[in-house]
Structure formats: structure tokens, C-alpha cells
Design a protein with these regions (language model features):
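Membrane-lipid interaction segments
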Residues: 1-433
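Primarily a LysM-type cell-wall glycan-binding module
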Residues: 426-463, 468-487
Length: 487
């Protein structure tokens, strides 16, 4: 099994000043900045973790004459996290979310691109669940009470790299000069489950592209989806029952090609999948003890235990308003993307590309928050699927409605205390006044409590009164014969 030794969510902000290429005209107005984060490396060393990657962005702007142009910008990402529990032998689980990407003009030839990245990093170390099965003492016979422990623990933490490729055909036209104005990729998980002891991760890479057609000033936007399906082994002693997965993009290659029958987009994506599989562990452990010849001081340990189960999918929606003169604008593209996720909610960014009467293109954005209702239990986001936004023009602006399907796991923690050792307080029998044979009226009281009270043992009481586990009478006796256990 594994135990989580590190869990931290940090936000990293990075920026870069980019110069408009010499082949392009001066910048008059910024339109939109699209981009994607690619994870290049994740490594652990003693008490630290290093995350390296890059945000590949496209800055779309308008020249003085209104013509749209774009150029690529790269924002390097280097994040260092420190933690006393980190070491080279831990295994990672990382979720990256591009929370914000923006650009502003410094002058007509320079822009400053700023990005905010949310990183949720967890580390797991292989370990054993130390349970107390018996207690021994030099002070005499120690009687123990055991209870069954049933918990869900990480039993496998795996990582796998893979590639997804597909050829897409442009349906709305042909890109001018065989290049895109901008593009952005999002990895969506459709289903994550356990089948035949292995983790099944199914999803798609959604690519949103914008391009100009020959002789047109208004951009065309299309969305292409490249599916993927991966099987990850779960080498573990316990049968896995639930899996939490994260899939990160490590590289994206897009190529536009034209032919007599139309234009196509060749998409090749390199990805890494990380999974944490939970399995059910059952064991008997000591929860109480006493000695018939001495007073004992018990040593306790709290086990961070709990169970986990997948909840029913949540269908959430949030509404908002972009204040503007909607009657004077035409929406030419709209989409919603996840820009933040936590255990209690997620953020969705709704982005509209609009044109006015003079065919000037601009971008309108609105961030909407959706709250999860977990019913008091601790929820863990498995994945979230944003749907296409609904946009309605009103007298006050554009009314937005964003819907998201959220799959969650519910964690029910339980503080389980076990006895790990005993210390003899005094070597005199604390039960000297207890008679050697006692008859008590039984009202269903716990046998372990009776055994401690009358210096007996639970097993002895069961044997004396015919209450063996394999031969329980239909009618329980009203009285119990409790013999005092000899040392």
C-alpha cells in the first residue's frame, strides 16, 4: 500500500515580454491570447520537487488597418516545492490547470504576456499499515479486545506516457496561408474506472482553433477532438475499487495541409497519465486491553483511516452577464473552459469572440464559479466536463449560462485508535475482590466490558455460556455465568 506524504496546491505566475516579429505590422489593439501548458519534467530530490514546463501561447492582435495577425510566445515554467517528506523514492500525482492567460500592449511593437498556473502536487510513498495484533506484558496475562478495521487506502500509484494522433478535416473553410491564428488544447476525462484489476482512463484532447479564410477579415473558429484510451496496471495485493487519474499534455504538434478536396489538421499529442488506485483493506487490530494481575497504562495510536466511494455525477450550472451593447455585436465564436478546480467547486471561463458593424474583432470574457454540494463529507474531484455555453443577447448585454458535469469521490474519514503497547503501573491484582464465579443479568451489554469488570475473558464467557461464533443460539440467555480467569 501507499500513504500520501505530500499534498500541496500552489499558483505560479510567470510573464514574458514578446516583440512583434519584423514581418508583421504594428500592433493597434489586442484581440485575444490563447495558450496551453505542457509538462516537460517532474522530478523529486531530497526534500524538494521540481516541475518544468512551458506555456505555448498565440497573441492575436489587430493592425491599424484592422487586419488580424498573430505570433507565438513561449512562457517557461519552473516551479520548486519544498517538503520534509519528499525524497527520490516517492511517486507523483500532478494536476495542472491554466487559470489565467492575458496580454497587454507595452507599445506598438511589444506585448507583455502573463499567465497564472495552478499546480496540485501529491506524493505517495510505499509503506505498510502497522496494526497491533497482540499485546504482551511481563506483568501477567494480558487480555485484548480486537475490532475489524475496514479502510480504503492507495494500493497502486502508476504513471504512463502515450501518444494520441488524428487527422481532422476543416468543415467551415480553408485557413489562409496554411496557418492558424491561434489554438488552445484542453485534456478532458470522460471516464475513469477499474476493469479486471487495471485502471481504464478514457478521454479526449479538445483543440479550439481560430483561422482566417482567404479574403476574409472575420476569424473562423472550429473545435476538434482527439480521443484516447489507456490501460494502466495496478500491481497490488488488494483488489482496486476506485481510481483517481490525471492526464497532462507534454507536447502538441499541429500541422495544416491543403488539398484539392479541402484542408486538414494533423494533430499529434504526447501525454502522461498518472493514477492512484484505492483498494479495500480489512484487518483485526487491538483496540483495548487489560491484565488480571496488574494495572496497565495503555499506549495509543490514531490511524488515519477512512473509506472512499464514487458519488453520483453532479450536473451544475452557473449564470452570469457580460455588460455590453449586445445588439451592436455579432458572436462569431464561443466556448467554455475549466480554469480552476478544487474539492468544493470549480471555475469556468466563458470566452466570446465578437465583431461589430465595422467587422472589428474583440474578445469578451466572464469567469463563473460553480459550487459543489458534498453533504458535509469531504469530496475529491475526479474530473469535470464543461459543456458549450449558452449565450443570449439582452438589452443589458450577453446573458451566459455554463454547465459542467462533475464526477466526485466522497471520503468518509474515521479516527481509528489502536493499542500499540502497555506499561505496568503496579504489580498487585486490581480484581482481588472479584468472586471466582459470578452470575449477572444480561441486557445485551458488550461482553468485553463484562470481561474487564469481572476479570474474565471474552472468549471464556462465550465458551461458558454457549455463545461461540459458530454456534450462536437463536434466543440469547437472560443471565450469564462469568468465571474469573486464573492467572
Amino acid at each position: 500500500m501507499y500513504t500520501r506524504v505530500f499534498d500541496r496546491t500552489e499558483e505560479e505566475t510567470c510573464s514574458v515580454d514578446a516583440v512583434v516579429p519584423d514581418a508583421l505590422g504594428d500592433l493597434s489593439a489586442l484581440v485575444v491570447t490563447e495558450g496551453t501548458f505542457c509538462l516537460w519534467n517532474l522530478a523529486f530530490s531530497d526534500k524538494s520537487a521540481q516541475i518544468e514546463g512551458c506555456i505555448a501561447a498565440d497573441v492575436v492582435y489587430a493592425e491599424e488597418n484592422g487586419a488580424l495577425r498573430s505570433f507565438p510566445v513561449e512562457l517557461p515554467v519552473k516551479v520548486h516545492m519544498s517538503g520534509e517528506t519528499l525524497a527520490e523514492d516517492v511517486r507523483p500525482w500532478l494536476r495542472c490547470t491554466l487559470a489565467a492567460l492575458d496580454a497587454r500592449a507595452v507599445n506598438s511593437r511589444k506585448v507583455r504576456v502573463t499567465a497564472r498556473l495552478s499546480l496540485c502536487l501529491r506524493a505517495y510513498r510505499e509503506t505498510e499499515l502497522a496494526l497491533t495484533e497482540r499485546i504482551e506484558s511481563e506483568g501477567g496475562a494480558v487480555f485484548t479486545h480486537t475490532e475489524p478495521l475496514c479502510v480504503h487506502v492507495p494500493v497502486a500509484v502508476e504513471e504512463q506516457t502515450f501518444t494520441a494522433t488524428q487527422m481532422h478535416r476543416f468543415s467551415d473553410g480553408q485557413p489562409e496561408t496554411e496557418r492558424l491564428l491561434c489554438h488552445a488544447e484542453t485534456v478532458l476525462l470522460d471516464e475513469v474506472h477499474i476493469a479486471d484489476g487495471r485502471a481504464v482512463v478514457q478521454g479526449r484532447v479538445r483543440t479550439s482553433v481560430s483561422y482566417l479564410q482567404q479574403g476574409q477579415s472575420c476569424p473562423v473558429s472550429e473545435t476538434f477532438e482527439t480521443p484516447f484510451s489507456q490501460l494502466l496496471d495496478c500491481p497490488a495485493d488488494a483488489e482496486p475499487c476506485l481510481v483517481q487519474a490525471s492526464v497532462s499534455l507534454t507536447a502538441a504538434y499541429l500541422n495544416v495541409s491543403t488539398a484539392a478536396d479541402g484542408a486538414t489538421l494533423e494533430a499529434e499529442y504526447h501525454l502522461v497519465a498518472q493514477t492512484v488506485c484505492f483498494g479495500e483493506l480489512t484487518a483485526e487490530c487491538v483496540t483495548d486491553a487489560y491484565c488480571n494481575t496488574a494495572q496497565l497504562q495503555l499506549e495509543w495510536e490514531t490511524i488515519p483511516a477512512g473509506t472512499v466511494q464514487q458519488a453520483e455525477p453532479l450536473h451544475l450550472a452557473a449564470e452570469g452577464m457580460i455588460a455590453c451593447d449586445a445588439a451592436a455585436l455579432t458572436v462569431c465564436a464561443q466556448r467554455a473552459e475549466l480554469c480552476g478546480a478544487a474539492s468544493d467547486g470549480c471555475d469556468v471561463l466563458v470566452r466570446l469572440l465578437v465583431t461589430d458593424a465595422e467587422q472589428h474583432v474583440s474578445c469578451l470574457e466572464k469567469r463563473l464559479h460553480l459550487q459543489f454540494e458534498t453533504g458535509g463529507t469531504r469530496g475529491e474531484l475526479l474530473y469535470a466536463l464543461p459543456e458549450a455555453p449558452a449565450v443570449t443577447a439582452t438589452a443589458d448585454g450577453f446573458q451566459l449560462r455554463a454547465a459542467v458535469t462533475v464526477d466526485e469521490a466522497q471520503f468518509c474519514p474515521s479516527e481509528f485508535r489502536q493499542v500499540t503497547g502497555v506499561t505496568v503501573q503496579e504489580r498487585v491484582c486490581p480484581y482481588a475482590a472479584v468472586p471466582s464465579l459470578t452470575i449477572v443479568r444480561w441486557n445485551g451489554e458488550d461482553l468485553w466490558q463484562l470481561s474487564k469488570r469481572y476479570c474474565s475473558s471474552e472468549r471464556c464467557i462465550r465458551e461458558t455460556n454457549g455463545l461461540l461464533d459458530d454456534d450462536v443460539p437463536v434466543e440469547l440467555p437472560q443471565y450469564l455465568l462469568i468465571p474469573k480467569t486464573e492467572v
